[in-house]
Amino acid sequence: MVLPTVLILLLSWAAGLGGQYGNPLNKYIRHYEGLSYNVDSLHQKHQRAKRAVSHEDQFLLLDFHAHGRQFNLRMKRDTSLFSDEFKVETSNKVLDYDTSHIYTGHIYGEEGSFSHGSVVDGRFEGFIQTRGGTFYIEPAERYIKDRILPFHSVIYHEDDINYPHKYGPQGGCADHSVFERMRKYQMTGVEEGTRAHSEEHAASMGPELLRKKRTTLAERNTCQLYIQTDHLFFKYYGTREAVIAQISSHVKAIDTIYQTTDFSGIRNISFMVKRIRINTTSDEKDPTNPFRFPNIGVEKFLELNSEQNHDDYCLAYVFTDRDFDDGVLGLAWVGAPSGSSGGICEKSKLYSDGKKKSLNTGIITVQNYGSHVPPKVSHITFAHEVGHNFGSPHDSGTECTPGESKNLGQKENGNYIMYARATSGDKLNNNKFSLCSIRNISQVLEKKRNNCFVESGQPICGNGMVEQGEECDCGYSDQCKDECCFDANQPEGKKCKLKPGKQCSPSQGPCCTAQCAFKSKSEKCRDDSDCAKEGICNGFTALCPASDPKPNFTDCNRHTQVCINGQCAGSICEKYDLEECTCASSDGKDDKELCHVCCMKKMAPSTCASTGSLQWNKQFNGRTITLQPGSPCNDFRGYCDVFMRCRLVDADGPLARLKKAIFSPQLYENIAEWIVAHWWAVLLMGIALIMLMAGFIKICSVHTPSSNPKLPPPKPLPGTLKRRRPPQPIQQPPRQRPRESYQMGHMRR
């Protein structure tokens, strides 16, 4: 009995030692453990991965033990968060910055795990998602100052984040009165004529245009960001690398949330940083720095960001380390599909205060009531504020606020991202959008994403195309009919992978059966074309092998061209050692020949003639070959229509055609001929016009005033309203009455 008691006491003491005796880091984090792995070794691994040429050296491995488990991180440089034109601006310098210290990976051997962070001076900072929740790693000196510690970093679990009760009236977001003032201001934007007309035209097209947009913009799913940090943010984190690591961590966090959300058929919404502006401590006194003042309210801080022109970006945010009133952690303009300005892709325009502003903006602070909030809190805040930009107001109603429900089952799942007050972040719904938010956001995305969203250039699991890093891709769970492949709704490490024991997937290519096996060598996988033979499966791959080309100079494209090396690329003239030319009317050719394929002898333009001419009868046997509709004709001065007529293109445009129509001599000749032929009709029209004018003068003359006093006065027009002067009251002298009778009369009134 004594031994178990001793063991329990030892385990309790060890647990307290690992968690720094159970002491919280600050009022937000109630439990942590220290990390003391070899920073020199990790720094060397980082330098090796940075210079890596071989595939294996590109991976960064980090192993450590914490919170009663082993972490074996396998990470690789993350380039998906920064655009090809990524720039870092600091103190009037623009740099092509190296982001090789940003990593993304997973825990080796743990399915569905995910990690993201940075390696600066041999220390990893970031977050690790596991089956048991998310862990956060930060430098120890960020929380524990002026002490010698046996560890250099701290790690804590998301469940150990303590959200204080006093979190502002709106839980980190501004109250309703602020949003109401912002909404009224957004309504005062003056739309530029061209953009307003294009938006009205798009709206008039209705659902048909939206369907076309959804098809053509399937890959335009990336919102490019411009992020600035003020001098207070830089002062807290200390270095440029640490600041960029924080930005990367925030963008990756919201990227994970938005990519996994289906916005009414719009999927894989992602984010990419295009430009970063870092205001260092030296910029605190710079008169050109709008954020240099220490005491700025949250609304004014957002306004300073909005006064800059952000037309080149989807969204523009400023990160700061300020303690705003009422515990506000973020503020952003709410987007709308139409009717008001603000949100994603909004362009700079003039507003009621006479200033031009960009309302595709927001702000985030990492300080709340004198303490710095954990990354988990600011990540959720960032996702919440971007949700406003995307068009979602705060959640309301029983459907979208289950945390307020009296049903314990619904209440246990918590509220969604766009809930007005603070969420703990550890409930099932805290990292998801409600149906209300999804409906609002999808409407804004349908209307606005074509204005500024770009193609990500990154592999997308769920788009039906097998790309780098994917074994297969059968789409999402509602689309995937494939028994061989895990759909895109599966967790990381599992989605777009072959199921165990399956040889292939039909999504890989046509040489895989629905039973997940390769087709035999004799099965056809591609029909023959003008210039290539049919494709035949090889029996050991799902891809259809390249087809053998047909012989060169085989006729193709309706006998107007010939095959060259398997491609329909040569002119039919080349088959007979001739060159193709253009029959032009200036050559005296018949207009009917302008849409014929014409050939000439090499280096002899004077021999240019139609394939149906006697000149080339020997080669083409009198067969006339016509150009395809839409082909240029008459020496590129027109195009062939479906009737093989050469339609000339008027380079002067519609105004010139209108001028020609009005002032054409032929027009006046035709009018003169008609008058001669129908002189009687012209005479009748002249008489009718004279009678009409006479009647008009006669009718109106009786109502017209005259200066001749002998004429009767004009008659008023029927229906004319006359203003009657009210009768003047007759003034009577007041009569003297006894006081009593006056009072009684006054009471009777």
UniProtKB/Swiss-Prot annotation:
Residues 705-749 are annotated as: Disordered. Its cofactor is Zn(2+). Binds 1 zinc ion per subunit. Glycans are attached at N268, N279, N440, N552. A motif (SH3-binding) lies at residues 709-716, 723-729. Zn(2+) binds at C173, H384, H388, H394. SMART domains: DISIN. GO terms for biological process: adherens junction organization; amyloid precursor protein catabolic process; amyloid-beta formation; cochlea development; constitutive protein ectodomain proteolysis; epidermal growth factor receptor ligand maturation; in utero embryonic development; membrane protein ectodomain proteolysis. It is an enzyme of class 3 (hydrolase). Keywords: Cell junction, Cell membrane, Cell projection, Cleavage on pair of basic residues, Cytoplasm, Cytoplasmic vesicle, Disulfide bond, Glycoprotein, Golgi apparatus, Hydrolase, Membrane, Metal-binding, Metalloprotease, Notch signaling pathway, Phosphoprotein, Protease, SH3-binding, Signal, Transmembrane, Transmembrane helix, Zinc, Zymogen. The active site is at E385. Its EC number is 3.4.24.81. InterPro entries: ADAM10_ADAM17, ADAM10_Cys-rich, ADAM_Metalloproteinase, Disintegrin_dom, Disintegrin_dom_sf, MetalloPept_cat_dom_sf, Peptidase_M12B. SUPFAM superfamilies: Blood coagulation inhibitor (disintegrin) (SSF57552), Metalloproteases ('zincins'), catalytic domain (SSF55486). It is a single-pass type I membrane protein. It is found in: Cell membrane; Golgi apparatus membrane; Cytoplasmic vesicle, Clathrin-coated vesicle; Cell projection, Axon. Residues 1-18 form the signal peptide. The keyword Electron transport does not apply. The keyword Ribonucleoprotein does not apply. The record marks R214, T215 as: Cleavage. Forms a ternary EFNA5-EPHA3-ADAM10 complex mediating EFNA5 extracellular domain shedding by ADAM10 which regulates the EFNA5-EPHA3 complex internalization and function, the cleavage occurs in trans, with ADAM10 and its substrate being on the membranes of opposing cells. Interacts with the clathrin adapter AP2 complex subunits AP2A1, AP2A2, AP2B1, and AP2M1; this interaction facilitates ADAM10 endocytosis from the plasma membrane during long-term potentiation in hippocampal neurons. The Cys-rich region C-terminal to the disintegrin domain functions as a substrate-recognition module, it recognizes the EFNA5-EPHA3 Complex but not the individual proteins. Both Cys-rich and stalk region are necessary for interaction with TSPAN5, TSPAN10, TSPAN14, TSPAN17, TSPAN33. Stalk region is sufficient for interaction with TSPAN15. Transmembrane metalloprotease which mediates the ectodomain shedding of a myriad of transmembrane proteins, including adhesion proteins, growth factor precursors and cytokines being essential for development and tissue homeostasis. Associates with six members of the tetraspanin superfamily TspanC8 which regulate its exit from the endoplasmic reticulum and its substrate selectivity. Cleaves the membrane-bound precursor of TNF-alpha at '76-Ala-|-Val-77' to its mature soluble form. Responsible for the proteolytical release of soluble JAM3 from endothelial cells surface. This is Disintegrin and metalloproteinase domain-containing protein 10. It comes from Rattus norvegicus (Rat). The gene is Adam10.
